[in-house]
A protein has these predicted regions:
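N-terminal leader/targeting and accessory segments in enzymes
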Residues: 1-67, 71
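Phosphate-binding loop of NTP-binding sites
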Residues: 64-188
Length: 188
Protein backbone atom coordinates (compact mmCIF):
# COMPACT_ATOMS: atom_id res chain seq x y z
CA UNK A 1 0.00 0.00 0.00
CA UNK A 2 0.97 3.63 -0.44
CA UNK A 3 -1.22 4.71 2.50
CA UNK A 4 0.54 4.29 5.84
CA UNK A 5 -2.86 4.20 7.58
CA UNK A 6 -3.72 0.98 5.72
CA UNK A 7 -0.49 -0.84 6.57
CA UNK A 8 -0.86 -4.12 8.44
CA UNK A 9 1.70 -6.63 9.65
CA UNK A 10 3.73 -7.99 6.75
CA UNK A 11 2.92 -5.17 4.27
CA UNK A 12 5.17 -3.34 1.84
CA UNK A 13 4.83 0.43 2.17
CA UNK A 14 5.44 2.47 -0.98
CA UNK A 15 6.62 5.95 0.00
CA UNK A 16 5.41 7.75 -3.11
CA UNK A 17 6.15 11.39 -3.87
CA UNK A 18 3.08 13.58 -4.14
CA UNK A 19 2.26 17.11 -5.18
CA UNK A 20 1.44 18.08 -1.57
CA UNK A 21 3.05 15.39 0.60
CA UNK A 22 6.02 13.06 0.30
CA UNK A 23 5.30 9.49 1.33
CA UNK A 24 8.74 9.21 2.92
CA UNK A 25 7.38 11.33 5.78
CA UNK A 26 5.17 8.37 6.72
CA UNK A 27 7.76 5.58 6.71
CA UNK A 28 8.09 5.49 10.51
CA UNK A 29 4.30 5.33 10.86
CA UNK A 30 4.11 2.48 8.33
CA UNK A 31 6.81 0.53 10.19
CA UNK A 32 4.95 1.07 13.46
CA UNK A 33 1.84 -0.43 11.83
CA UNK A 34 3.74 -3.53 10.69
CA UNK A 35 5.43 -2.79 7.37
CA UNK A 36 8.27 -5.24 6.78
CA UNK A 37 9.55 -3.47 3.67
CA UNK A 38 9.52 0.04 2.26
CA UNK A 39 9.89 1.22 -1.32
CA UNK A 40 11.51 4.65 -1.39
CA UNK A 41 13.16 7.08 -3.76
CA UNK A 42 16.91 6.60 -3.80
CA UNK A 43 17.42 10.10 -2.33
CA UNK A 44 14.83 9.77 0.45
CA UNK A 45 15.82 10.42 4.04
CA UNK A 46 15.03 7.36 6.15
CA UNK A 47 14.00 7.29 9.81
CA UNK A 48 16.09 5.28 12.28
CA UNK A 49 13.38 2.60 12.41
CA UNK A 50 14.06 1.77 8.74
CA UNK A 51 17.09 -0.25 9.83
CA UNK A 52 14.63 -2.92 11.03
CA UNK A 53 12.96 -3.48 7.64
CA UNK A 54 13.86 -4.22 4.04
CA UNK A 55 14.49 -0.96 2.16
CA UNK A 56 14.13 -0.93 -1.61
CA UNK A 57 15.60 2.22 -3.15
CA UNK A 58 14.70 3.23 -6.68
CA UNK A 59 14.77 6.23 -8.98
CA UNK A 60 11.05 5.79 -9.84
CA UNK A 61 8.94 4.65 -6.89
CA UNK A 62 5.61 4.98 -8.72
CA UNK A 63 6.66 2.84 -11.67
CA UNK A 64 8.29 0.21 -9.47
CA UNK A 65 5.28 0.09 -7.13
CA UNK A 66 2.98 -0.63 -10.08
CA UNK A 67 5.30 -3.40 -11.26
CA UNK A 68 5.41 -4.91 -7.76
CA UNK A 69 1.60 -4.67 -7.45
CA UNK A 70 1.09 -6.45 -10.77
CA UNK A 71 3.42 -9.27 -9.67
CA UNK A 72 1.74 -9.52 -6.26
CA UNK A 73 -1.82 -9.70 -7.61
CA UNK A 74 -0.82 -11.72 -10.72
CA UNK A 75 -4.25 -12.30 -12.30
CA UNK A 76 -5.62 -9.97 -14.98
CA UNK A 77 -8.35 -10.23 -17.59
CA UNK A 78 -7.00 -11.81 -20.77
CA UNK A 79 -7.88 -8.79 -22.92
CA UNK A 80 -7.56 -5.21 -21.67
CA UNK A 81 -8.40 -2.07 -23.63
CA UNK A 82 -7.23 1.22 -22.08
CA UNK A 83 -8.85 4.46 -23.24
CA UNK A 84 -7.31 7.89 -22.65
CA UNK A 85 -8.16 11.42 -23.76
CA UNK A 86 -9.57 14.62 -22.36
CA UNK A 87 -13.18 13.57 -22.81
CA UNK A 88 -15.10 10.56 -24.02
CA UNK A 89 -13.31 7.92 -21.95
CA UNK A 90 -16.38 6.88 -19.95
CA UNK A 91 -18.60 6.58 -23.02
CA UNK A 92 -15.95 4.71 -24.99
CA UNK A 93 -15.33 2.03 -22.34
CA UNK A 94 -19.08 1.64 -21.88
CA UNK A 95 -19.55 1.21 -25.64
CA UNK A 96 -16.74 -1.36 -25.78
CA UNK A 97 -18.32 -3.40 -23.00
CA UNK A 98 -21.73 -3.22 -24.67
CA UNK A 99 -20.27 -4.26 -28.05
CA UNK A 100 -18.52 -7.26 -26.51
CA UNK A 101 -21.72 -8.26 -24.74
CA UNK A 102 -23.80 -7.92 -27.92
CA UNK A 103 -21.24 -10.02 -29.83
CA UNK A 104 -21.65 -12.86 -27.32
CA UNK A 105 -18.71 -12.12 -25.02
CA UNK A 106 -20.54 -11.91 -21.70
CA UNK A 107 -17.45 -12.16 -19.50
CA UNK A 108 -16.70 -8.46 -20.05
CA UNK A 109 -16.40 -5.45 -17.78
CA UNK A 110 -15.70 -1.73 -17.75
CA UNK A 111 -13.70 0.19 -15.17
CA UNK A 112 -13.45 3.94 -14.74
CA UNK A 113 -15.31 7.04 -13.59
CA UNK A 114 -18.51 5.07 -13.01
CA UNK A 115 -16.66 2.34 -11.12
CA UNK A 116 -16.68 -1.31 -12.16
CA UNK A 117 -19.50 -2.69 -14.26
CA UNK A 118 -19.81 -6.34 -15.26
CA UNK A 119 -22.59 -8.93 -15.32
CA UNK A 120 -23.66 -9.22 -11.67
CA UNK A 121 -21.07 -6.64 -10.52
CA UNK A 122 -21.55 -2.93 -9.91
CA UNK A 123 -18.98 -1.19 -7.70
CA UNK A 124 -18.66 2.57 -7.58
CA UNK A 125 -15.21 4.14 -7.72
CA UNK A 126 -13.60 7.35 -6.53
CA UNK A 127 -11.09 7.95 -9.33
CA UNK A 128 -11.21 7.61 -13.10
CA UNK A 129 -8.15 5.37 -12.82
CA UNK A 130 -7.86 3.84 -9.33
CA UNK A 131 -4.66 4.13 -7.30
CA UNK A 132 -1.99 1.57 -8.18
CA UNK A 133 -2.71 -1.04 -5.51
CA UNK A 134 -6.49 -0.78 -5.93
CA UNK A 135 -6.24 -1.04 -9.71
CA UNK A 136 -4.13 -4.20 -9.67
CA UNK A 137 -6.30 -5.74 -6.94
CA UNK A 138 -9.38 -4.98 -9.07
CA UNK A 139 -7.79 -6.55 -12.17
CA UNK A 140 -7.10 -9.71 -10.15
CA UNK A 141 -10.62 -9.74 -8.67
CA UNK A 142 -12.19 -9.42 -12.12
CA UNK A 143 -10.03 -12.19 -13.58
CA UNK A 144 -10.80 -14.42 -10.58
CA UNK A 145 -14.54 -14.22 -11.28
CA UNK A 146 -14.02 -15.06 -14.95
CA UNK A 147 -13.88 -11.65 -16.63
CA UNK A 148 -11.84 -12.08 -19.82
CA UNK A 149 -12.42 -8.69 -21.50
CA UNK A 150 -11.98 -5.33 -19.75
CA UNK A 151 -12.32 -1.82 -21.14
CA UNK A 152 -10.85 0.69 -18.70
CA UNK A 153 -10.34 4.42 -18.51
CA UNK A 154 -6.72 5.55 -18.38
CA UNK A 155 -6.73 9.10 -17.02
CA UNK A 156 -3.83 11.41 -17.83
CA UNK A 157 -3.05 11.53 -14.10
CA UNK A 158 -3.08 7.73 -13.91
CA UNK A 159 -0.74 7.44 -16.88
CA UNK A 160 1.61 10.14 -15.58
CA UNK A 161 1.72 8.42 -12.18
CA UNK A 162 2.42 4.98 -13.74
CA UNK A 163 -0.72 3.45 -12.17
CA UNK A 164 -1.29 1.24 -15.22
CA UNK A 165 2.27 -0.05 -15.45
CA UNK A 166 2.19 -3.81 -15.16
CA UNK A 167 -1.31 -4.02 -16.66
CA UNK A 168 -1.25 -6.19 -19.79
CA UNK A 169 -2.96 -3.76 -22.16
CA UNK A 170 -3.72 -5.21 -25.61
CA UNK A 171 -5.23 -2.10 -27.14
CA UNK A 172 -4.79 1.58 -26.28
CA UNK A 173 -7.28 4.13 -27.56
CA UNK A 174 -7.01 7.92 -27.63
CA UNK A 175 -10.21 9.97 -27.84
CA UNK A 176 -9.04 13.60 -28.03
CA UNK A 177 -6.87 16.28 -26.46
CA UNK A 178 -7.85 19.67 -25.08
CA UNK A 179 -6.55 22.18 -22.56
CA UNK A 180 -8.18 20.54 -19.52
CA UNK A 181 -5.87 19.49 -16.67
CA UNK A 182 -3.19 22.06 -17.52
CA UNK A 183 -3.10 22.80 -13.78
CA UNK A 184 -1.54 19.34 -13.41
CA UNK A 185 0.36 18.82 -16.68
CA UNK A 186 1.40 22.48 -17.22
CA UNK A 187 1.53 22.19 -21.03
CA UNK A 188 0.18 20.15 -23.90
Amino acid sequence: TADSRQVKKGFLFAALPGSKQDGSKYIADAITHGAVAVLVHEKATLPDTAKDVIVIKTDNTRKNFAQIASKFYKLQPEHIVAVTGTSGKTSTVSFAQQLWHLSGITSCASLGTLGVSAPGIQRYGKLTTPDTASLHAELADLAAVGITHLAMEASSHGLDQFRLDGAHVDVAAFTNLSRDQLDYHKDM
